[in-house]
Swiss-Prot record:
The lineage of its organism: Eukaryota, Metazoa, Chordata, Craniata, Vertebrata. GO terms for biological process: defense response to Gram-negative bacterium; defense response to Gram-positive bacterium. Signal peptide: none annotated. This is Antimicrobial peptide 3. It comes from Xenopus tropicalis (Western clawed frog). Has antibacterial activity against Gram-positive bacterium S.aureus and Gram-negative bacterium E.coli, when in combination with XT1 and XT6.
Length: 25
């Protein structure tokens, strides 16, 4: 459903953001 899709998107976004923050280029 919509909630599941948004949850997955937010999860991926948060994970990517954390990696970028912890491992800056």
């Amino acid at each position: 459903g919509l909630a599941s899709t948004l949850g997955s998107f937010l999860g991926k976004f948060a994970k990517g953001g954390a990696q970028a923050f912890l491992q800056p280029k």
